[in-house]
Amino acid sequence: MKRLLGVLATAALLVPATQTQAAVEPDCRLYTALALEVGWDKREIPRLMQICKRESKGFARAWNQRDPYTGSYGLMQINGSNKGFLQDAGIVRKAMTELWAPRKNLKAALALFKRHGWLPWKGNSAPK
């Protein structure tokens, strides 16, 4: 009996606990203060957060491998085609995976926004 209890206890540790999606899904609004800190205008924050939710659902290490330009990275899903621009801007040093750091990702998004507005994100995420 003790052996059976030991086996069951071990098995219970190996089975992941079930959680609701809401309990494990991050919230882009957690990055509001950081976005303001790196230079985003507070008037742009609602749209920024809406795009963040659409692009990554708040997962800082989101990576879209299917993107044809070596993927899209991080909160704002920055496209690999922007690597040269981001290197010239001093945001990315070597690898686009550096954009998994939320601060760096929001800086990159701001640099792209200042250059192109919301176009890199299709420009269709205005809050109603």
PLM regions with names:
Residues 2-4, 12-58:
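Export/targeting segments at the very N-terminus of extracytoplasmic proteins
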Residues 24-25, 38, 43-50, 61, ...:
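Catalytic and binding regions of secreted/periplasmic enzymes and modules that target cell-wall glycans
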